Amino acid sequence: MSTAHRVAVVTGASQGIGAALVQAFRSRNYKVVATSRSIKPVADSDIATVRGDVADPNTADLVFKQALDRFDRVDTLVNNAGMFMAKPFTAYSKDDYAAYVATNVTGFFHMTQRAIEIMNKQGNGHVVTITTSLVDQPMTSVPAVLASLTKGALNAATKSLAIEYAKKGVRVNAVSAGIIKTSMHPPEAHQFLASLHPMGRMGEESDVVDAVMYLDSARFVTGEILHVDGGQAAGHHAIEQGTGLGDLRVAG
């Protein structure tokens, strides 16, 4: 099918990686439904925007109603919305835990379930989820057990769904990212964050976008957890002495 008739749904689409994904899909002639809690309408008639919290099932209902009403189908879902807080395990609050589960797990569940329902009827589709390589290689300098707990669950769900729907034309993959240079990270933290990767630099938004686009075009790839992390998942490496992350918060 020509990409002129393909439709992508992107969550966490108002900034950072999500906004870059929207533009990448449009550059490939996809029509896009973009959602986040703060997204605003855009002039491009081939982008539908839906403001809402992915943890709310009503948001998923609205997103996929827009996709079908305006564009007739859903070919790709990118579960990009997510949150991250680096802090010691005993410092997490009940509210932190609830917020993590709501955004990272509940949001994934509602969005993916509705997407696959549509893709099943079409006989094809692709779901790709952004996770973290801290699942594979925890770091003493980045205590983030709730990220590992929730994003690790998404890695497991990716493989499970890939097998469940392999013969139904629906592929399910994930991009396991390192720390990506976005506006959420202050410039004074970049040197330390770069040191957390064996390649010695932070990832760029384009690194994740390229990985998503590869997976979207790789028709014989499903159940893949593609690491885009500058070597983090490959093993441990020496980190220069310096200031740690403290209480780092990232929300998509």
Where are these regions (language model features)?
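C-terminal substrate-recognition "lid" of short-chain dehydrogenase/reductases
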Residues: 171, 204-228, 233
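Substrate-binding pocket helix/loop in short-chain dehydrogenase/reductase
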Residues: 88-89, 96-98, 193
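Conserved glycine-rich cofactor-binding loop
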Residues: 14-15
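A short, exposed helix-loop element centered on a Lys and neighboring polar residues
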Residues: 112-113, 159
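Catalytic loop of short-chain dehydrogenase/reductase
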Residues: 128-153, 158-159, 163-167
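Short C-terminal tail/terminal secondary-structure segment
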Residues: 222-252
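Active-site loop of short-chain dehydrogenase/reductase
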Residues: 5-6, 73-74, 119-132, 167-170, ...
